[in-house]
Amino acid sequence: MANNPGAKKAIRKIARRTEVNTARRSRVRTFLRKFEDALAAGDAAVAKAAFIEAQSELMRAVSKGVVHPNTGSRKVSRLAARLKKLDQAAA
């Protein structure tokens, strides 16, 4: 248990940041799920819109430090590849 005031404040700050980061991570997962659903449905237009939202949310999480930059880029790259595959299958 923290004894000095600085350590107690650090615990309070960490708790607040953890709550915010958890919400951000959850939001990213929600947008990724929407993209997955659009891909499963096979609707290229909806998937494209969902991809743009998911990419935006992932990069926002990267800029806030919730997700490592390489992880965010890798996920976006894989999502884009899957979207491209869907577009080519539809064409």
Swiss-Prot record:
InterPro entries according to UniProt: Ribosomal_bS20, Ribosomal_bS20_sf
SUPFAM superfamilies named among the record's database cross-references: Ribosomal protein S20 (SSF46992)
GO BP annotations, alphabetical order: translation
Domain of life: Bacteria
Pfam families associated with the record: Ribosomal_S20p (PF01649)
PANTHER family found in the cross-reference section: 30S RIBOSOMAL PROTEIN S20 (PTHR33398), SMALL RIBOSOMAL SUBUNIT PROTEIN BS20C (PTHR33398:SF1)
Family statement drawn from the similarity comment of this UniProt entry: Belongs to the bacterial ribosomal protein bS20 family.
Protein name, UniProt field: Small ribosomal subunit protein bS20
Organism of this sequence: Caulobacter sp. (strain K31)
Gene: rpsT
